[in-house]
Amino acid sequence: IHGQTIGFRSFLKTTTYSKLTFEYHHMEEFRRGGDLLNRPPHEANVAEQTEHSINGGGLKYDYFSPNEKHSFNVFASAQHINRDSYYGGGQDLNAYGNTTDLNWMAGSQYVYSFGKCIFMPSDLTAGIEFNQDKLEDNMWGYHRTVDQKVNIGSAFLQNEWKNDHWGFLLGGRLDKHNLIDHIIFSPRANLRFNPTQNINLRLSYSSGFRAPQAFDEDLHVENVGGNVAMVELAKDLKEERSQSLSASADIYHRFGAFQINFLVEGFYTKLSDVFALTDGEVKDGILTRTRYNA
């Protein structure tokens, strides 16, 4: 394995209450596994080799009001990946491949600080975001191509009431995924209680989802075992959902110059409509497996 990385991050103070931040990075990485490492991968008995070229960058504008009640930002970022790969065994000349992935996102977020909202001070946060990912994975020797384009539009809203002893957070997120025919709502809630400065008790609930996708890195791993595989999505495939509940108690105590911290934490997560793969069937020399909800 060897690699090199170069990049920069900088900002420009546009006014007393605003700034513009920009960054860029470039990375090259080579990895090789298997045997006969001093020979080309197709001359080895088993080989995994990847060579990445990654370019990415972002731009962000932040504004803060003079009275510190309003803050606003707008951002955009993008990353392009080009990867040449070999996953195969038995001196297989067909196991070379190439993967390209272009991902970009843009969005905005607004925060308003209430001196008092109903019963205590709070911060209201609202935002929107759009994310697009276009991936193409080719293994020409096996006539296998995966072309996947994903668009996700999101909006979120939350309000957090807080003082020295209590904190209440209620919020939710709406997501529209182009591979799912309905809007997904993901709520979240958090309760914090500090009976003293050294004791922090917290109870949280959150939910999320995992969208269907045809591409899976495990496809390349199967090639090493001699199997050429593709994944199809079942027609009635739904998103995978998660519901999580967590609780924690965080206690601090100081003994002279020393401070100890005691933390107890527990969580419970429930998954529904979990993704699974069929054993599949061979079509034209390619193992085709179907992703479905278990």
Model-derived regions: residue spans:
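Short loop/turn motifs that connect adjacent beta-strands in outer-membrane beta-barrel proteins
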Residues: 16-19, 65-71, 113-123, 164-165, ...
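Transmembrane beta-strands of outer-membrane beta-barrel proteins
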Residues: 20-22, 70-76, 106, 122-128, ...
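Membrane-embedded beta-barrel scaffold of Gram-negative outer-membrane proteins
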Residues: 71-85, 194, 202, 236-293
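Flexible loop and strand-edge segments within Gram-negative outer membrane beta-barrel domains
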Residues: 3-5, 13-72, 78-103
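Extracellular loop and loop/strand-boundary signature of outer-membrane beta-barrel proteins
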Residues: 39-48, 60, 87-98, 137-147, ...
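Surface-exposed extracellular loop regions of Gram-negative outer-membrane beta-barrel proteins
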Residues: 1, 27, 32-33, 71-88, ...
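Residue-level signature of outer-membrane beta-barrel architecture
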Residues: 12-14, 62-65, 100-102, 110-116, ...
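Transmembrane beta-strands of outer-membrane beta-barrel pores
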Residues: 26-30, 63-65, 78-82, 112, ...
